[in-house]
A protein has these predicted regions:
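Short, well-formed alpha-helical segments that are part of the catalytic scaffolds
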Residues: 12-27
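Hydrophobic helical membrane-anchoring modules
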Residues: 1-2, 177-244
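Acidic helix N-cap motif at the loop->helix transition within catalytic regions
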Residues: 15-19, 43-52
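Short beta-strand/loop segment that forms part of the nucleotide-sugar
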Residues: 8, 22, 31-41, 63-65
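Alpha-helix termini
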Residues: 25-29, 52-57, 81-88, 195-207
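Acceptor/aglycone-binding surface of glycosyltransferases and processive sugar-polymer synthases
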Residues: 65-84, 89, 101-184, 221-223
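A conserved acidic beta->alpha catalytic loop
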Residues: 38-47, 97
């Protein structure tokens, strides 16, 4: 595996942040580094992150945002910090580990292919795969993904899974160079920005450079900050991206 940075945005995650899981993974994967971004948490998240980083400083780093900026900006700040180092790949991962850390290896293996620049985890319920989602969330998610694919001409099955890794290059740095226009569906805006860069260069379709990987395991974790009403806010943001 090439040298990889994983951004982990954290807002009030003190009870859900699985320190032992991160440490065990880091011990067995010396080429993976974690950047935990404390997004102005008002609980003990910062203390948990600092304790985690002290216990394994070689591969774990803390970025402390004094004010809550939202997940989109927290992820972006993490990428900007990672750009200061010589990482081959940079991605982001949900702090609750709904997607197991072992999937990092799977996504990174996709980036070993010459032309692939984007590796996306996808929650596809296949035979023998353990994808545990609440039915209502699943159907709302499928509706949103279908609308996104149709409106933005992005043939992506699952835009919102919080497990994505990218090759570190000038295009990626351009994508993250300025704040996102949306708060909830920045995952979609990332792909749209990348698509526009590729098109401006005359390099064809984003589909030539991105791969979705069905995850073997994904588990809905209690305490999610995403509410049903947020799907309606996401629809409004989708229109905003469409007008970019």
């Amino acid at each position: 595996m090439q040298k990889t940075a994983i951004i982990v945005p954290c807002y009030n995650e003190s009870y859900r942040l699985k320190a032992e899981a991160f440490i065990n993974y880091a011990k067995n994967n010396k080429m993976v580094y974690f950047f935990f971004v404390n997004d102005g948490s008002i609980d003990d998240t910062l203390e948990v992150i600092n304790s985690l980083c002290r216990s394994y400083p070689e591969q774990m780093h803390c970025i402390d945002l004094k004010q809550n900026c939202g997940k989109a900006e927290a992820v972006r700040q993490g990428f900007l910090k990672a750009f200061e180092f010589d990482f081959n790949n940079i991605g982001y991962w949900d702090a609750d580990l709904a997607t197991p850390l072992e999937a990092i290896n799977t996504l990174c293996s996709l980036l070993d292919r010459k032309q692939i620049k984007i590796a996306i985890g996808s929650r596809v319920k296949l035979l023998g795969y353990r994808i545990e989602r609440a039915p209502l969330r699943h159907y709302l998610g499928r509706l949103f993904a279908t609308c996104s694919s149709y409106m933005l001409r992005l043939h992506v099955y699952d835009t919102q899974c919080g497990a994505k890794i990218f090759k570190n290059n000038s295009d990626l740095q351009n994508v993250f160079s300025h704040p996102f226009n949306v708060r909830w569906i920045f995952d979609v805006e990332i792909l749209v920005r990348y698509k526009m860069i590729i098109q401006d260069k005359g390099l064809g379709s984003l589909e030539n450079y991105a791969l979705e990987q069905p995850l073997e395991k994904w588990t809905h974790i209690q305490g999610s900050k995403v509410k049903i009403r947020d799907f309606f806010l996401a629809a409004l943001e989708l229109i905003k991206i469409y007008r970019m």
